[in-house]
């Protein structure tokens, strides 16, 4: 006698390989939507941040300690788009990892390294803005290009060293050998991190973020006081030098506001992922795959948001984009073009 009920067909990532992961693909319509959304975010992260780097490095008027930090931050976000988002897009939509175990480790290493690099960049930018707002007279001597270069070096060397040491020595899953063995399959890229290392990761994210929030709270209070002072004195201004100082003060306040929005966007984007992996490590890795992917892509999309924030708040960036896209940037004298409306 034959049964009228057939067993559901199990799809595998690699049909002809023993120990292959199970594939749980989306419907064709959902796949198109997801690929479109993720491709847009990836391309924006790559080309948007490429525009930021080109603008700062090409136009001499933008050669300042703060802008060099912004360009370096854009480089970290650019690398997220190139080395992380494009491959994560395939993993998310296809529910399989087709790029090999070695590249899975490299992918995870880059993911963590560039995240912490962004945190440190933003933290140093906060310190820079705090100095320029609280002590503008000595800012030029305190936060020089050399100091900015040291901050940039630290923002790259520490995260790359930490991430490489964790993932390439295997200490991330010490004590979780049974769980790793149970979850291990061909076509998967799920990095397991022990509770101790997850807690360290959380603190590495939380402490600099807390410092940034405290600094920007002070910055905005001071900027508000300066705004009141400017409104009071602007009507009494007679000399062109005083008028120039007021314009510069307004520009610095706007820069502080823009970078504050950047920090807020970073915290909102990365907090769900950071909290999720912290809870997951102490609850037995029970987070559903779709929740984990939502948290991941919320964090990834932060790399695409910064160029949009700059375009929205910085007139000089919009002007630089026009010059780059029009080809005027190729002219011999383009690097000396004035980008500020003064």
UniProtKB/Swiss-Prot annotation:
Disulfide bond annotation, renumbered to this chain: 21-185, 104-189
GO molecular function: G protein-coupled receptor activity; trace-amine receptor activity
GO cellular component, one term: plasma membrane
Annotated PROSITE patterns: G_PROTEIN_RECEP_F1_1, G_PROTEIN_RECEP_F1_2
GO biological process, one term: G protein-coupled receptor signaling pathway
UniProt keyword list: Cell membrane, Disulfide bond, G-protein coupled receptor, Glycoprotein, Membrane, Receptor, Transducer, Transmembrane, Transmembrane helix
Annotated glycosylation sites: 4, 18
Expression across tissues: Expressed in kidney and amygdala. Not expressed in other tissues or brain regions tested.
Protein name per the record: Trace amine-associated receptor 8
Domain of life of the native organism: Eukaryota
Topological domain spans for side Cytoplasmic: 53-67, 133-146, 217-258, 302-342
Family (UniProt): Belongs to the G-protein coupled receptor 1 family.
Membrane topology type: Multi-pass membrane protein
Residue ranges of the TM segments: 32-52, 68-88, 112-132, 147-167, 196-216, 259-279, 281-301
Role summary: Olfactory receptor specific for trace amines. Trace amine compounds are enriched in animal body fluids and act on trace amine-associated receptors (TAARs) to elicit both intraspecific and interspecific innate behaviors. Ligand-binding causes a conformation change that triggers signaling via G alpha proteins, possibly G(i)/G(o) G alpha proteins.
């Amino acid at each position: 006698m034959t049964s009228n009920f057939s067993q559901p067909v199990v799809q595998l990532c690699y049909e002809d390989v023993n120990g292959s992961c199970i594939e749980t693909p989306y419907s064709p319509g959902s796949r198109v939507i997801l690929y479109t959304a993720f491709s847009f975010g990836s391309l924006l992260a790559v080309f948007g941040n490429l525009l930021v780097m080109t603008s700062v490095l090409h136009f001499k008027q933008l050669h300042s300690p703060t802008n060099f930090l912004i360009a370096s931050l854009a480089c970290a976000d650019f690398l997220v788009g190139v080395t992380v988002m494009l491959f994560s897009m395939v993993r998310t939509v296809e529910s399989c990892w087709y790029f090999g175990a070695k590249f899975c480790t490299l992918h995870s290493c880059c993911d963590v390294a560039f995240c912490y690099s962004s945190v440190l960049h933003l933290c140093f930018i906060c310190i820079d803005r705090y100095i320029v707002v609280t002590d503008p007279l000595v800012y030029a001597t305190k936060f020089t290009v050399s100091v900015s270069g040291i901050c940039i070096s630290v923002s790259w060397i520490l995260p790359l060293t930490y991430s490489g040491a964790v993932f390439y020595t295997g200490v991330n899953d010490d004590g979780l050998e049974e769980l790793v063995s149970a979850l291990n399959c061909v076509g998967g890229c799920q990095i397991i991190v022990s509770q101790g290392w997850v807690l360290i990761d959380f603190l590495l994210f939380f402490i600099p973020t807390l410092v940034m929030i405290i600094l920007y709270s002070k910055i905005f209070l001071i900027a508000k006081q300066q705004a009141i002072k400017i409104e009071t004195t602007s009507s009494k201004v007679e000399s062109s030098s005083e008028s120039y100082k007021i314009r510069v003060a307004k520009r610095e306040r706007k820069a502080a506001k823009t970078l504050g929005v950047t920090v807020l966007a970073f915290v909102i984007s990365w907090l769900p992922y950071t909290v999720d992996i912290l809870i997951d490590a102490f609850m037995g890795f029970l987070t559903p795959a779709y929740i984990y992917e939502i948290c991941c892509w919320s964090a990834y999309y932060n790399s695409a948001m910064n160029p949009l924030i700059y375009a929205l708040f910085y007139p000089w960036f919009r002007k630089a984009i026009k010059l780059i896209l029009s080809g005027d940037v190729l002219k011999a004298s383009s690097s000396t073009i004035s980008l500020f409306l003064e």
